[in-house]
Amino acid sequence: MLKRFLSYYKPQMGLFVADTICALVLAAIDLAFPIILRNLCGGLFTQGQTAIMQALGMIAVGLVLMYATRCACRYFVSYWGHVMGARMESKMREDLFDQYERFSFAYFDRNSSGDMMSRVVNDLFDICEAAHHVPEWIIICGIEIIGSFVILFTIAPVLALAMAVVTAVFAVIMFWQNMRMREVFSDNRKKISGINAQLQDSLAGMRVVKSFANEQTERSKFRASNDRYLSSKENMYHAMGVYTATYGLLSGVLYVIVVLLGGWLVAQGQLQAVDMATFALYISLFCTPLETLVNSAETYQKAIAGFKRMDEVLSTVPDIQDKPGAADLQVTAGAVEYRDVCFSYEDVELGAGDGTRPVIDHMDLSIKPGQTIALVGPSGGGKSTTCSLLPRFYDVAAGSISIDGQDVRDVTQRSLRQSIGLVQQDVYLFDGTIGENIAYGKPGATAEEIAEAAHRANIDAFIESLPQGYDTVVGERGSRLSGGQKQRVAIARVFLKNPKILILDEATSALDNESEEAVQESLERLARGRTTIIIAHRLSTIKHADEIATVEHGRVVERGTHEELLARGGTYARYYRMQFEGARAHELD
């Protein structure tokens, strides 16, 4: 973990060295002033008026130059030091985001978006505050503490040693308290993630919350999460309070030692009064960096807790990766074949399976180039999972899936997914314009290409009727558009992508009849000349398919045309009668 953290300093090494030099100069100047004052008081200022007045000009020039240098160094440390930290934070954030993008669906199934956002935002801010400040504080404070002690030892060894013993005892106590603070800050980080996750979940589902009038339920859930965070924060501040109080006791004890032991040494003639005054000045210089280090414990502990959480993500090996030397997928015809495929979810969720058998159980399915095949069957039977395995959103546990004879595990994920277009029931539109959302299918597409895709998706007339046209903002998740409009925007971006293979996963199930008719026409146009897999619970929308496969318990139990399956009188025929003969309402996933 330390090696990874230090690697972020490498690109900023020039700034780091300059920042370190400025920190050294700051510490040296702070150490120099008390000893300069001691020498002046014990030497020059004991001479006559003439000698003092002649030297004051030179002293003034020297002090002005010294503190002008200090001012310049302080500016550099404050400005460029923070710039260095900000650049490191930016690189860490990019690395974390890139790592998130490498993960398969399984990772996002197990982790909440609120927790992931907390790692990218809250944790990284604390990490980079420490990345800049902690080295600076260690250098400045370390030199001032050690330098002060060395100077104090040359002035009064007995008094300096007494201070060292007391400081060592307190250091052991504070180190133990520091370990306790690390646990508290780590727990606090988890509680922050809990609040972010709960907040994100509630806000994203606010329309559902209001439709059920469950605002009070969500308030209760949020307050419970907030109370846990408050309790954690109270524990954190308690630990910090004990820590800072211990420091306060240390500085008080040191001053008592200086007054009592120093006074005794003066009385014994072993210490001059001017030296005791200098000693008092250095005590302040000795304690101030100690206080800085104590106060930095919060920043340091937050950074440690945050970087551990970041390191957990960066150290996680993506479960789906390209093979070394993987070639790009070359789709010539678009033939798809599932051969003896088995798959089960690592964490079984509602509808994914019962945990006792694979979701996909030795499935065999061949799809000819340009063929449209529809998958039907009961909820949890494995239809959506079958489609998710083709673009390698999940990897098969056994068997193989190939496109034009190429195993999907042997080609690059990028080329594989670029060859597959996906239109789902739950369309996700980004918070941008309609044009930007369509162009997502082909980044860098021209305005003419975007307009042509919209025309083919039967949404160009609607877009052009809007005052802002293609520059109309759709809102978060497309909230300003209707369900049918969102579906056609999604279809338009797949037209723009122009893939050889198409997956339609219940693309019309949530639409009214009028919207469904318009979207269905667009989908049929999209599917022409492409190998297409359709999942639909409205059997009327798949009668045009070349073949229909019934999937139950992760296997294809029957396959044929609409007419063939009806004549066979099997599972498909039973579902068809349920829908169209009014036997009873039955929905298929």
Predicted regions: what they are:
Residues F105-A106, N122-A131, P135, I139, ...:
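An intracellular "coupling" helix at the cytosolic face of ABC transporter transmembrane type-1 domains
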